[in-house]
A protein has these predicted regions:
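N-terminal Rossmann-like NAD(P)+-binding domain of SDR-like oxidoreductases, especially those catalyzing
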Residues: 1-176
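Hydrophobic aliphatic residues
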Residues: 45, 78, 108, 185, ...
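Residue-level signature of the cytosolic catalytic core of signaling kinases
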Residues: 46, 58, 182-186, 244, ...
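Conserved donor sugar-nucleotide recognition element shared by glycan-biosynthetic enzymes
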Residues: 145, 153, 186, 248, ...
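Hydrophobic alpha-helix immediately C-terminal to the catalytic Tyr-X-X-X-Lys motif of short-chain
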Residues: 152, 156, 160, 193, ...
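Heptad-repeat alpha-helical coiled-coil signaling segments
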Residues: 175, 181-182, 211-213
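C-terminal substrate-binding subdomain of Rossmann-fold SDR/epimerase-dehydratase oxidoreductases
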Residues: 195-311
C-alpha cells in the first residue's frame, strides 16, 4: 500500500511513519516542521520506501502533491494542537484544523485517494460529559475552539464521503504519551515530568492533583490508525483509550518511581479551563476494529523515560 502521512514529523505522526514502513508500505511524509521535529524522521529517511515533503496543509499545492504521491490512504495528523492557543487565536486554529482538512479532502477526492484516516480528539469534542468512561454516543459539546474545529473537520470529511465517495474514519485518542512526545503543554505531561525529573529540576502539579486523564501509549494509538485504514468503520469516530482514569498526582508518582527521583512536586493553583476528568470508552474500537490498548501505564512510562534518558 502507498500511504501519505500529514504531520509526519510530529510525535504521533513519526511513530506512525515508522510502523507503516515496518509493515512494508511506501510512505510519503508531509510536514511544515513548525512544531514537528525533522530528527523524528531520521530513521525513516534512510529507507527506500520513504519520501519527505516539507509543506503545510493550508498553503501547499495539495492536489499536485497527492497527484504525484498517488497514495491509497492518507493519514491526516497535521494540526494545531494547543487548546490554549485556540482560545487566544481561534481564527488561526480554524485555518489549520478546519480549512486544512477541507483542502486535503478536496485534493484527495480529485487524486483518487481511497480513504482518509483523520486524527480527531477524544477529549475536546465531548467537553464535560455526563458519563465516564465516555463513549462515542455522548453529545458533542466542545468547550474550546480546538474541540469545535476538530468536530467541524469530522463533519466536512463525512460530507465528502456522502458527496464523492471519499471514505474516512476518525480516530479520537485520549491523552497520548510515549517516545518523541514534546515535553510541554498539558497533553505532554508524561514527557514534562520525565524530562524534569531526569534533569533534577522541579515539577509542578496544578490544583489538588486530583484531575484525571486517560493515558494511552503511542504504539497503541498508531495501531488504531493502521487498523482504521481498511473498510471497517466508514464515516465513524472511534475513541482510542484505556478506560482507566489516572490522577495527576498518581501519574507523578509513577514517573518519579521509574526515574528514581523524589516524588515531591510543587503545588500550583488550578489552571483556568482545565477539565476535571477525561476518560474514554473504547469498546466500539474493540468491536469494529479489533483494537484494544495493550500497553500498561507503568510499561509505557518506562519506555518514555528510557527515551528521554537517551536524549
Amino acid at each position: 500500500m502507498r500511504a501519505l502521512v500529514t504531520g509526519a514529523a510530529g510525535f504521533i505522526g513519526s511513530n506512525l511513519v515508522d510502523r507503516l514502513l515496518a509493515d512494508g508500505h511506501g510512505v510519503v511524509g508531509v510536514d511544515d516542521l513548525s512544531s514537528g521535529r525533522a530528527a523524528n524522521l531520521d530513521g525513516a529517511r534512510g529507507q527506500s520506501g520513504f519520501a519527505f515533503v516539507e509543506a503545510d496543509v493550508v498553503g501547499a499545492d495539495l492536489i499536485g502533491l497527492l497527484a504525484e504521491a498517488k497514495p491509497e490512504v492518507v493519514y491526516h495528523l497535521a494540526a494545531q494542537i494547543d487548546v490554549r492557543r485556540s482560545v487566544a487565536d481561534p481564527q488561526f486554529d480554524a485555518m489549520v484544523n478546519v480549512i486544512g482538512a477541507v483542502r486535503l479532502a478536496e485534493a484527495a477526492r480529485r487524486s483518487g485517494v481511497r480513504k482518509i484516516v483523520n486524527a480527531s480528539s477524544g477529549g475536546a469534542i465531548y467537553g464535560v460529559p455526563k458519563n465516564y468512561p465516555t463513549n462515542e454516543a455522548a453529545p458533542a459539546d466542545p468547550a474550546s475552539p480546538y474541540g469545535a474545529a476538530k468536530l467541524a473537520a469530522e463533519a466536512y470529511l463525512n460530507s465528502f464521503r456522502h458527496l464523492y465517495g471519499l471514505d474516512c474514519t476518525h480516530i479520537a485518542p485520549a491523552n497520548v504519551y510515549g517516545p518523541r512526545q514534546e515535553p510541554h503543554g498539558e497533553a505532554g505531561v508524561v514527557a514534562v515530568f520525565a524530562r524534569a525529573l531526569l534533569a533534577g529540576e522541579p515539577t509542578t502539579v496544578f490544583g489538588d492533583g486530583s484531575n484525571t486523564r486517560d493515558y494511552v501509549f503511542v504504539d497503541d494509538v498508531v495501531d488504531a490508525f493502521v487498523r482504521a485504514s481498511g473498510d471497517a468503520g466508514s464515516g465513524q469516530r472511534f475513541n482510542v483509550g484505556t478506560g482507566v482514569e489516572t490522577s495527576d498526582r498518581t501519574l507523578h508518582t509513577v514517573v518519579a518511581t521509574e526515574v528514581g527521583a523524589p516524588d515531591q512536586p510543587r503545588s500550583a493553583p488550578a489552571r483556568l479551563g482545565d477539565l476535571k476528568r477525561s476518560c474514554l470508552d473504547a469498546r466500539k474500537a474493540e468491536m469494529v476494529l479489533s483494537w484494544w490498548a495493550r500497553v500498561r501505564l507503568d510499561d509505557g512510562v518506562r519506555a518514555t523515560v528510557d527515551y528521554f534518558r537517551g536524549c
